[in-house]
């Protein structure tokens, strides 16, 4: 797994390369990260990567040529390692929203090249010539694509075999297929009683079936309350059992009473 990032701020990516579980995995060689600054692919004394937009308007637009040259260099470096050409992902508010399914797809491949835009955006001709995918974190605007790329890489890398100490941890994450796309249940650790609030009794029982059922019901309760559309999706995909449906019906009864 190799990620390449085209960015004006390569130092930002030390966060995912050097810190936490992704940093440890990088040190172990489970994935690689290479940053490419488009300023290194300019030919003027000022290393210009942006200019005013045609037609007028506020802000500046990133120029196509430095970006395309950076992508070409990244693809060539991948080819030299025997890797196939990577998808080129532009972080953009016009992109498809990134979710756990996208992270799983990304983790199953050999990596990607992320394009981190700045200013008002990037020249459309670069998008048409080089970009294969556009992705977004959500309906809000960031100062650049770097934070979005960091989040997307983190979500994908933690799914790689050997990255997490407990291989089952990722399977129990919210939105994961092992949870049928639902939110995860609440978690508790020591002490057994904190400020007068005890750990729920089922978690102390040692009865694995009861613990599993309690966690499933809490997952259903939380998802129905916070993200009801995920319940409908799971239902439409046939992921809810009869016991799940009975519990959800009881929740509806609680709300009505």
From Swiss-Prot:
InterPro entries in the record: Alpha/beta_knot_MTases, tRNA_m1G_MeTrfase_C_sf, tRNA_m1G_MeTrfase_TrmD, tRNA_m1G_MTases_N, tRNA_MeTrfase_TRMD/TRM10
Binding site for S-adenosyl-L-methionine: 117, 137-142
GO cellular component: cytosol
Biological process annotations from GO: tRNA N1-guanine methylation
Intracellular or extracellular location(s): Cytoplasm
Record key words, sorted: Cytoplasm, Methyltransferase, S-adenosyl-L-methionine, Transferase, tRNA processing
Catalytic reaction equation(s): guanosine(37) in tRNA + S-adenosyl-L-methionine = N(1)-methylguanosine(37) in tRNA + S-adenosyl-L-homocysteine + H(+)
SUPFAM superfamilies: alpha/beta knot (SSF75217)
Record Pfam families: tRNA_m1G_MT (PF01746)
The keyword Methyltransferase appears for this protein: yes
The UniProt record lists the keyword Cytoplasm: yes
Main location: cytoplasm
Gene3D superfamilies in the record: 3.40.1280.10, tRNA(m1g37)methyltransferase, domain 2 (1.10.1270.20)
GO molecular function, one term: tRNA (guanine(37)-N1)-methyltransferase activity
Enzyme Commission number(s) of this protein: 2.1.1.228
Stated family: Belongs to the RNA methyltransferase TrmD family.
Subunit details: Homodimer.
Record's function text: Specifically methylates guanosine-37 in various tRNAs.
Name this polypeptide is given: tRNA (guanine-N(1)-)-methyltransferase
């Amino acid at each position: 797994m190799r990620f390449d990032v085209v960015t004006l701020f390569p130092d930002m990516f030390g966060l995912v390369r050097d810190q936490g579980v992704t940093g440890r995995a990088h040190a172990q060689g489970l994935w690689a990260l290479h940053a490419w600054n488009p300023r290194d692919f300019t030919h003027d004394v000022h290393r210009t990567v942006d200019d005013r937009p045609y037609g007028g308007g506020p802000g500046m637009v990133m120029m196509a040529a430095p970006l395309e040259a950076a992508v070409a260099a990244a693809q060539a470096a991948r080819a030299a390692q025997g890797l196939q050409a990577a998808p080129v992902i532009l972080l953009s508010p016009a992109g498809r929203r990134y979710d756990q399914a996208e992270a799983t797809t990304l983790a199953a491949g050999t990596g990607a090249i992320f394009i981190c835009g700045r200013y008002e955006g990037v020249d459309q001709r670069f998008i048409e010539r080089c970009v294969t995918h556009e992705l977004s974190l959500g309906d809000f605007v960031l100062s650049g694509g770097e934070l979005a790329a960091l989040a997307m890489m983190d979500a994908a890398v933690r799914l790689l075999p050997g990255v997490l100490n407990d291989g089952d941890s990722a399977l129990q994450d919210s939105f994961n297929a092992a949870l049928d796309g639902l939110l995860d249940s609440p978690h508790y650790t020591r002490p057994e009683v904190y400020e007068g609030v005890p750990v729920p009794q089922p978690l102390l029982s040692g009865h694995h079936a009861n613990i599993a059922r309690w966690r499933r019901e809490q997952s259903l309760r939380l998802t129905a309350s916070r993200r009801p559309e995920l319940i409908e999706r799971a239902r439409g995909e046939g992921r809810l059992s009869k016991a799940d449906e009975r519990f959800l019906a009881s929740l509806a009864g609680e709300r009505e009473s």
